[in-house]
UniProtKB/Swiss-Prot annotation:
One of its GO terms (cellular component) is plasma membrane. It holds the Pfam family MFS_2. It comes from Synechocystis sp. (strain ATCC 27184 / PCC 6803 / Kazusa). GO terms for biological process: carbohydrate transport; sodium ion transport; transmembrane transport. It comes from the Bacteria. The lineage of its organism: Bacteria, Bacillati, Cyanobacteriota, Cyanophyceae, Synechococcales. The keyword Membrane applies. It is found in: Cell membrane. InterPro entries: MFS_2, MFS_trans_sf, Na/Gal_symport_CS. GO terms for molecular function: symporter activity. This is Uncharacterized symporter sll1374. Belongs to the sodium:galactoside symporter (TC 2.A.2) family.
Length: 544
């Protein structure tokens, strides 16, 4: 017999380990989206148009490799499953190339020659990092529909994922703020140390997820006996790191009090301790075990890419999800990439305060994530998206009107923006497993990797063009790039207008598009229940 629609519940430790898998990609992506453009223009000294081109080329290459990795992941056959081997194999180069993004090599004493050398270097590193990012993150995202087919449980699972994602984003900003405070007026060293620490945290969290999770009907990477032996060691190591941080903070080891190193040790200790805790309690759910005579789930179809694209475009619900996701994340990342310029050049605040404003956004998003998750038990996903986006659009209107000196209003608007940002995290990714189910009903095949890859592909192409246009607009508006080692220059009025337009009206335009698409999204709770019932009936008939 197949699992009933109310079954396929996941243990708390499984959800926790799954959530940890998005911690590493989230903290790397968060620092990149908030500070990479600023780093390239104001620390490395690259003109804004070239800096925007670095981001565009990296993202377009990233978009190209998404469907390739998705198809390869779908077709992977191993005793551990289709997704976990990719996560495990890609995490080390992922961390190494991330660290390399924050280095500033010297190519020539001639300023123009050095700028072009840096441009080529950062393009190459961006392409390599984005390939590694896809290798670990895309198979991870495709795990959601494989771990459970329960409508509400998928939303809960994504709540854990985005709790780690938003929580990690918040913690990465705190780490940046502490590093900036500990290393004032040394931006190159700030970003260099930040890159190393973020990389270590990312590898640790990815290991936690890949080694604790088990794919449906497959062997775990760590045997039960090895899990039992490792659990107390990891927990002890985590506690030791936290105690070291506490001792350093209270000057018991000759330290300088609580600083970014203490905070880093605490984060690393929590990851290792959480890893050990989930290994200690790691009983496998019944529906994930390989049982005799159990019906097989849909298998991946070995079709050419163009034919798969044709099938994807024939799935009307999928097109809506792509549009909603693209609009939401263009709004998120356009605002994030320009925020530091807005805070410094328009509001007259320092770079460090851009981190605290971003914290207000993401802290609110983290809290609201659980509020929306609770409401999702009663409301359709598109209703939740509509409510959050309306609040968000109001905040964007306020950002256009806020004036220098109105700092309290700026933080208030950041909090309201966080209410909407949380739905951009939660809702599109909760919709896509339902689309995969609909595709299986129509085709008899499960192609999670392809759908997740193609969804992200379009998002990245759109984002690449958006970020390139931001850089190009800044350059055309007369934006003055900071010379390394010099104070931040005063921008002309034309550049200030371009910064304000990119931080408020432009994201609001994309949010409006997402709202319109959400209204017509066809898969409601009742429709999804009917899809799952038809799939279960088909599986039972095939088994008979």
């Amino acid at each position: 017999m197949s699992q009933s629609l109310s079954a396929e519940k996941l243990h708390f430790t499984t959800k926790l380990a799954y959530g940890a898998g998005d911690f590493g990609p989230a903290i790397t992506a968060n620092i990149l989206v908030f500070y990479l453009l600023f780093f390239l223009t104001d620390v490395a000294g690259i003109p804004a148009a070239l800096a925007g081109s670095v981001l565009m080329i990296g993202k377009i290459f990233d978009a190209i490799n998404d469907p390739i990795i998705g198809l390869l992941s779908d077709r992977t056959r191993s005793r551990w499953g289709r997704r976990l081997p990719w996560m495990l194999g890609g995490m080390i180069p992922f961390a190494l190339f991330y660290t390399a993004q924050w280095l500033i090599p010297h190519f020539s004493d001639d300023r123009l020659t050095n700028q072009w050398g840096l441009f080529i270097y950062y393009v190459a590193i961006a392409m390599a990092f984005n390939l590694c990012y896809t290798t670990v993150n895309l198979p991870y995202t495709a795990l959601t529909p494989e771990l459970t087919q329960n409508y509400n449980e998928r939303t809960r699972l994504n709540s854990f994922r985005f709790a780690f994602s938003i929580g990690g984003s918040i913690l990465s900003l705190i780490l940046y703020i502490l590093i900036a405070a500990g290393l004032p007026d040394r931006p190159q060293q700030q970003f260099g140390e930040l890159g190393v620490m973020i990389s270590v945290l990312s590898i640790s969290a990815l290991l936690w997820s890949a080694l604790r999770l088990q794919e449906k009907g497959k062997e775990p990477i760590l045997s039960p006996s090895l899990r039992r032996r490792l659990a107390p060691l990891l927990m002890a190591a985590g506690i030791t790191l936290i105690l070291l941080a506490i001792a350093k903070s209270f000057n018991l080891l000759g330290g300088s009090g609580f600083d970014y190193i203490s905070f880093f040790l605490i984060l690393l200790g929590l990851i290792w301790g959480g890893f050990g805790f989930t290994l200690r309690d790691s009983a496998v759910e019944e529906h994930l075990q390989k049982l005799e005579n159990s019906p097989s789930p849909g298998v991946t179809e070995n079709l050419p890419l163009l034919k798969q694209l044709k099938i994807a475009f024939s799935n009307r619900a999928f097109l809506f999800v792509i549009g909603i996701y693209l609009c939401s994340w263009l709004a998120v990342q356009l605002t994030a990439s320009i925020l530091v310029y807005f805070v410094v050049s328009w509001m007259g605040l320092n770079e460090q305060q851009s981190g605290t404003i971003a914290l207000a956004v993401q802290g609110t998003a983290l809290v609201m994530l659980f509020v929306w998750q609770a409401l999702a038990q009663f409301l359709d996903k598109k209703v939740i998206y509509f409510l959050g986006s309306m609040v968000w659009m109001g905040a964007e209107a306020g950002l256009w009107l806020v004036q220098p000196g109105q700092v309290a209003l700026l933080y208030t608007l950041a909090i309201f923006a966080g209410v909407g940002v949380s739905v951009a995290y939660l809702i599109p990714w909760s919709m896509i497993p339902d689309v995969v189910d609909l595709d299986e009903l129509n085709t008899g095949k499960r192609r999670e990797g392809f759908f997740y890859a193609f969804m992200v592909l379009l998002q990245k192409v759109g984002l690449a063009l958006g970020l390139f246009l931001v850089g190009l607009t800044l350059e055309a508006s007369g934006f003055i790039a900071r010379i390394p080692g010099e104070p931040i220059p005063i921008q002309p009025d034309s550049a200030l207008w371009a910064i304000r337009f990119a931080v408020a009206p432009l994201p609001a335009f994309f949010l409006l598009g997402g709202l319109i698409l959400a209204i017509f999204y066809p898969i409601t709770r009742a429709v999804h229940t009917d899809i799952r019932q038809q799939l279960q009936a088909r599986q039972q008939n095939n088994h008979i």
